[in-house]
């Protein structure tokens, strides 16, 4: 079977790419090895409970009617509206360290005041950081990468405040140990602090349902339980993919959202010794707790807590199975839903060592 475009992986990026291509009359096929779409952001059922995995909340939330922010722009590209995702904003989140706590909601002025109240000597420096962020072109792909730690620490002189600012940005949008590229820092700072967090009442499955429905309505084809076993190259470009069921698909263009390392391993003439790549070092483990009452009834009203219990925030691969000294605690119940969720849920995410987990019998 021949297509204009074949996309490997039905995660959010694969589905979004498929929508764009199919909308403009390309014959598109997305192949997904699992029986559910979503990739790292998916869902499953166990007993009578429904669980989301991956996505805690959507960043870049802005009130309806704002048109110039990234999320409305993205939705327009996908021919969707804000109402399609049925997003409900957070109530309040917090960055909690041993000696300080900084609250934030979807009103940026509130966060600015929290900085001034908790770090009065850094108030002017924080304003300087805001000017630096607003003047930086984070979308310029030709900008030379620079250390975000270096830039921020040259402006904010209190290491504690530096760590507290970095904590949520790293957990929600950084694949680099210890530091992050300043352009990525700017993107995450704007998306979490200047814009905000929200989620649909039905969780990630609602977002995925919307994307799949839109993709199919544009004429896109979706094959699930359809693992790719190999990529065939001719004259330096991939021309076809082999599927686990024995089928071969050809296409003018083949896109992969499976990850660089995973994609390279699919090449028919793959030789890892000749390919210069490094697998990511960061992994996470999640604990999901089901409660018999609303968390607010127990005095817990926070949507998301980004915490660190150590003297310094050390964002890196731990030397043990799980590092519980820092992490993210998400309570889906504490978003501004019209109706209460069926049950209380607490999701705890911590950094983990994949190598140690992979060796467990």
What are these regions (language model features)?
Residues 328-329, 333-361:
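FAD-dependent oxidoreductase catalytic-site/capping-region signature
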Residues 96-181:
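Rossmann-like flavin
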């Amino acid at each position: 079977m021949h297509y204009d475009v074949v996309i490997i992986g039905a995660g959010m990026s694969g589905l979004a790419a498929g929508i764009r291509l199919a909308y403009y009359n390309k014959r598109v096929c997305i192949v997904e090895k699992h029986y559910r779409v979503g990739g790292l952001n998916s869902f499953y059922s166990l007993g009578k409970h429904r669980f989301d995995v991956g996505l805690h909340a959507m960043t870049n939330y802005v009130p309806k009617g704002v048109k110039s922010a990234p999320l409305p722009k993205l939705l327009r590209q996908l021919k969707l509206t804000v109402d399609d995702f049925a997003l409900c904003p957070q109530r309040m989140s917090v960055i909690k360290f041993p000696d300080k706590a900084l609250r934030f909601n979807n009103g940026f002025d509130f966060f600015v005041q929290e900085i001034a109240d908790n770090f009065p000597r850094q108030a002017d420096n924080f304003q300087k950081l805001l000017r630096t962020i607003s003047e930086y072109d984070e979308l310029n792909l030709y900008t030379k990468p620079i250390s975000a730690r270096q830039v921020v620490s040259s402006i904010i002189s209190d290491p504690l405040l530096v760590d507290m600012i970095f904590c949520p940005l790293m957990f929600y949008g950084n694949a680099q140990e210890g530091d992050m590229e300043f352009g990525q820092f700017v993107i995450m700072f704007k998306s979490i602090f200047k814009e905000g967090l929200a989620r649909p009442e039905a969780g990630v499955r609602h977002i995925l349902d919307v994307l799949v429905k839109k993709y199919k309505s544009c004429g896109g084809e979706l094959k699930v339980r359809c693992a790719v076993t190999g990529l065939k190259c001719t004259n330096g470009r991939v021309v076809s993919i082999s599927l686990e069921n024995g089928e071969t698909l050809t296409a003018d263009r083949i896109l992969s959202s499976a990850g660089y390392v995973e994609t390279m391993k699919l090449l028919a003439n793959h030789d890892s010794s000749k390919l210069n790549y490094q697998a990511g070092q960061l992994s996470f483990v999640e604990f999901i707790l089901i409660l018999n009452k609303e968390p607010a009834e127990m005095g817990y009203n926070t949507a998301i807590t980004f915490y660190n219990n150590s003297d310094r925030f050390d964002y890196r691969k731990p030397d043990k199975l799980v590092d519980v000294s820092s992490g993210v605690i998400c309570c889906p119940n504490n978003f501004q839903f019209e109706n209460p969720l069926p049950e209380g849920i607490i999701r705890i995410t911590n950094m983990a060592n994949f190598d140690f987990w992979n060796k467990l019998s």
